[in-house]
């Protein structure tokens, strides 16, 4: 039935807004009305499009790059957040895990991966996921270590389910290798083959996806053109024209960058997680 879970949606959004606005001091902005190619496309293989004012645009998948724009243009602010709708035309959706259209709560902040991890642990504490009497004590490990534990090269949704069994209800999976195709603006470690990325796995499902952003313009340009063996850039060029895409990329890379991070929270997944933990 339509709207059957509206009370839980209202409760969880209210808690997230209170944490980021009142506890952390971030500002809420609206990103859904922005026209963009790069800021909309996180996974070009799942893009759906619409025609507006004589041009083809992607239905937005994320508002995080727009939050970056806000933070880069207003560096006096502590951070920004938004409530958005993500359109993911998943070719092979997994029942119970993938919605093709779903609400997201997204945020951007000043600081690197350590600050990002701290804020996310504070958020989980605020929502009530911490063990009684404990704070900021969530298990964490690098992607490669966890993949080795399960005897695979790449982790998938089955392994996320194992993580709840092996590490508990909330687990921080960090430092993703380039073979997992992290977004092109993520900061790389010194080894240049891992990204400063954190997925927060709650009750066996990635519920928060986040990363530190790059400040290296040449690295971002190279990553844009080579990620997924060039398939990311070529898919965008084919759908929207190389000139339009390149113009957006060049405009973004002209900005004055500083250390920053951000992430997105899948609302249906967070509601699920809070239900399973009896928090709503």
What are these regions (language model features)?
Residues 1-47:
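TRNA-binding/sensing appendages of the translation machinery
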Residues 2-11, 110-115, 135-136:
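Cytochrome P450
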Residues 15-16, 119, 248:
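Short, hydrophobic/aromatic alpha-helical segments in well-folded domains
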Residues 27-28, 131, 259:
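Residue-level detector of short coil/turn "hinge" positions at structural boundaries
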Residues 45-110, 114, 140-280:
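A translation/RNA-centric and nucleic-acid-associated enzymatic feature enriched
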Residues 117-128:
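Short amphipathic C-terminal alpha-helix that caps PH/PH-like domains
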Residues 127-137:
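Flexible helix-coil linker/hinge segments at domain or subdomain boundaries
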């Amino acid at each position: 039935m339509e709207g059957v879970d509206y009370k839980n949606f209202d409760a969880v959004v209210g808690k997230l807004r209170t944490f980021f606005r009142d506890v952390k001091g971030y500002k809420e902005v609206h990103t859904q009305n922005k026209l963009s190619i790069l800021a909309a496309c996180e996974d070009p293989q799942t893009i759906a499009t619409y025609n507006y004012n004589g041009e083809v645009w992607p239905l937005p998948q994320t508002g995080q790059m727009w939050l970056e724009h806000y933070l880069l243009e207003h560096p006096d602010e502590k951070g920004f957040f938004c409530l958005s709708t993500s359109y993911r035309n998943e070719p092979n959706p997994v029942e119970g895990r993938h919605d093709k259209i779903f609400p997201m709560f997204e945020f951007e902040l000043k600081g690197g991966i350590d600050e990002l991890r701290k804020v996310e642990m504070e958020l989980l504490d605020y929502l009530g996921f911490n063990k009684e009497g404990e704070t900021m004590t969530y298990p964490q490990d690098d992607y490669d270590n966890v993949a080795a534990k399960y005897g695979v090269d790449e982790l998938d949704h089955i392994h996320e389910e194992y993580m709840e069994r092996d590490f508990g209800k909330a687990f921080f999976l960090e430092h993703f290798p380039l073979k997992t195709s992290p977004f092109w603006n993520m900061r790389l470690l010194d080894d240049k083959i891992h990204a400063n990325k954190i997925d927060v796995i709650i009750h066996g499902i990635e519920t928060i996806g986040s990363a530190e952003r790059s400040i290296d313009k040449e690295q971002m340009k190279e990553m844009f053109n080579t990620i997924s063996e060039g398939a990311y850039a070529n898919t965008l060029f084919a759908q929207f024209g190389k000139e339009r895409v390149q113009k957006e990329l060049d405009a973004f890379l002209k900005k004055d960058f500083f250390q920053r991070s951000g992430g997105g929270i899948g609302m249906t997944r967070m509601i699920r997680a809070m239900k399973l933990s009896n928090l709503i």
